[in-house]
Amino acid sequence: MVNRTAIIKQPDNISCFNDVYKLQKEYQEALILDNSNPDFIWIGEHQLCYTLGRGSNYDNLLFSLNDEKYDVFKIDRGGEVTCHMPGQLVTYLILDLKNFNKDLNWYLRKIEKIIIKILGNFNIDCHLKKGFTGVWIENKKIASIGIGCRRWITINGFSINFNCELENFNKIVPCGIENCLMANMIDYNKNLNIKEVKKIVKKIIQEEFNFDFVSK
């Protein structure tokens, strides 16, 4: 496969979800209009917020939408409600699947493979769970996936809990899974820092998609 150029952004600050979502939409629209434009990868952290997919059930929010303490966004992805917050590493991939494989099931399995390789790099033993999307450690979920796709241009991506306040997941039914327990990477390898994990995320995505990265 010929290497494809991708723009990568890895901000050090904690980012507002809505600002980054608008950025994703801009890059997606640019690729739809002209597929010679580069793909786009964003790796970072968000301020506390909750996001719902296109068909999400609002019953999985265990607080009122009128409660101004919580920022809630309905976005272009599949899946149910999830939570983003500092200490959780989020990766967005705006890719033209026509250059890889026009198969969303293939793409989801690819992301799961990437997550397992990332965690394995830090000697964290994880696995898939039959009937569910995402990655698990023992009986706890450590990584969630939510994607959208328009004209084979993807949006959104995956999150890995690094060292976040897992209590924030108690405000929802995570991914619509009753009694879903969540896990942090740091609980399984104390000698980690999030900057090192970000480097490995970048490296593995570059290898799996044969990207030439350009920082912007």
Swiss-Prot record:
Localization per Swiss-Prot or TrEMBL: Cytoplasm
Catalytic activity: octanoyl-[ACP] + L-lysyl-[protein] = N(6)-octanoyl-L-lysyl-[protein] + holo-[ACP] + H(+)
The BPL/LPL catalytic domain, residue ranges: 35-213
Binding locations of substrate: R77, G78, G79, E80, V81, T82, C83, H84, S144, I145, G146, G157, F158, S159
Gene Ontology cellular-component terms listed: cytoplasm
Any one GO biological process: protein modification process
Pathway(s) annotated for this protein in UniProt: Protein modification; protein lipoylation via endogenous pathway; protein N(6)-(lipoyl)lysine from octanoyl-[acyl-carrier-protein]: step 1/2
Annotated catalytic residues: C175 (acyl-thioester intermediate)
GO molecular function: lipoyl(octanoyl) transferase activity
EC number: 2.3.1.181
Free-text function comment from the UniProt entry: Catalyzes the transfer of endogenously produced octanoic acid from octanoyl-acyl-carrier-protein onto the lipoyl domains of lipoate-dependent enzymes. Lipoyl-ACP can also act as a substrate although octanoyl-ACP is likely to be the physiological substrate.
Note: In the reaction, the free carboxyl group of octanoic acid is attached via an amide linkage to the epsilon-amino group of a specific lysine residue of lipoyl domains of lipoate-dependent enzymes.
Family of the protein in this entry: Belongs to the LipB family.
UniProt name for this protein: Octanoyltransferase
Originating species: Prochlorococcus marinus (strain MIT 9312)
